[in-house]
């Protein structure tokens, strides 16, 4: 294929018996008149986009069986977007050749079940000859045949229409949308249009009201429908689909039927305009650019929901919280994410989030989910937001945008340290500890779950827990991430060592528990700028001496760490525990590490930032903010 041809949006290949007028058709198209002297075969022709009705660059290839070997012919056919099989209406043998030679050759090239459209072109129709009785059975028996056009290169009859239909067959193909055998929408098309309907059903009542229909019309086509046009649409649907209209609104069945009507009436471009507005490619899959927009995240930066992203996901919650109880029941949650290809929030990963006593996702837990995913798995956030309909309508007519507007890239941490402040909302805390140190109980407490809840959690559960905490009268998200290491010699990944704060948990009743924490700290976090704190668990039990060079308190003094914090029974299940507030404060203000060291951790956790702050710790914090 030539370099110029690789730029073509549509590649049309003409095949057919010798003498059918393939070359004459191309010459008549180029010259806009009949040409008496034509070559045996033309080289490839490239037609610029600005002279085509659909504004697409088009390549036309004139194949000659006699002049080329079969392998080359097959190779050329395989590169085609659409194939025109040319026959002569004055020669019935060329009609027979469609079934005996050309369609089999096309299937040999693409495989028995292919989706490359085929157009039958009956040339030399300037006389009285008519082959309709033979052509119609061919079209009915071969679903890849999109249409048949009779034309005349001599009189210019339908010459430009042939190539227009060929372009349309590629740009607005029928087969992905319509099953010619069942005369119904394909499963892929139904699934895509159901997603479109659910996104446009703003109030989630199962209907498209006149307002929602008009919003849909303006979004996809740039102009509103008149009241008369709206009534005509609903009347046409009611006539053919009794269940399509109710309460003077369009139901899902009616919406699907409306697009079936468009396709059956040859208005495929209408349905394709809708589908492409909502991100679909010809394969009826969402485009990669739509799902995964390119983004560069500098080292030291993180990603969070932007105000637009927060507004979008918050509105989704309101839309699908049908009983307005501030929670999403399993059915409401399933309904919200029904347009996504795979389950989003499962029984396992819901343990990372706040739920009510029935295990239903609260609004707080729902928003925490999006903040967690955006921080640790941005690709997943992009994908899910795209399926859910963000940012349809933001990028102009005929195209879906991308999800970049849904997120913001935070400032580099190094600059935050230099400026003694940050505008970040989400912070990650690494939770490190030996087996049975109480990590699961500690982490689940952030989600408000007590011992009885933890007892029901299986061994395989999410290594994350996230919730909102208050820091200096601001709402932040603290994401706890458990480090799954069996021994302190196990290596930590770069993602694990780049946390905002680290909590080392040790069991005061296990003499070997602290050694695990001390070893990991010295190996990975000593002399780094990451704030760290030791947390003593199971403090109601009898404390034993730890098998380490020095006791935990002395270890913290030597390494200028805050004194160990006690995680007691009273903290279990308390998402508002001062311990979580202190971890968040250390993450938000890492430049205050020495303040945390100089002062008692329990005192510091109780500090209230306001107009008047007492004690030395308050003075030091104010001085360094």
UniProtKB/Swiss-Prot annotation:
Ca(2+) 1 binds at residues 201, 203, 205, 207, 212. Mitochondrial GTPase involved in mitochondrial trafficking. Probably involved in control of anterograde transport of mitochondria and their subcellular distribution. Plays a role in maintaining mitochondrial morphology. It comes from the Eukaryota. One of its GO terms (biological process) is mitochondrion organization. Residues 623-625 are mitochondrial intermembrane. CDD domains: Miro1, Miro2. The lineage of its organism: Eukaryota, Metazoa, Ecdysozoa, Nematoda, Chromadorea. It is found in: Mitochondrion outer membrane. Residues 1-601 are cytoplasmic. One of its GO terms (molecular function) is calcium ion binding. Residues 188-223, 308-343 form the EF-hand domain. Residues 3-170, 420-625 form the Miro domain. Ca(2+) 2 binds at residues 321, 323, 325, 327, 332. GTP 2 binds at residues 433-440, 470-474, 537-540. This is Mitochondrial Rho GTPase 1. The gene is miro-1. It comes from Caenorhabditis elegans.
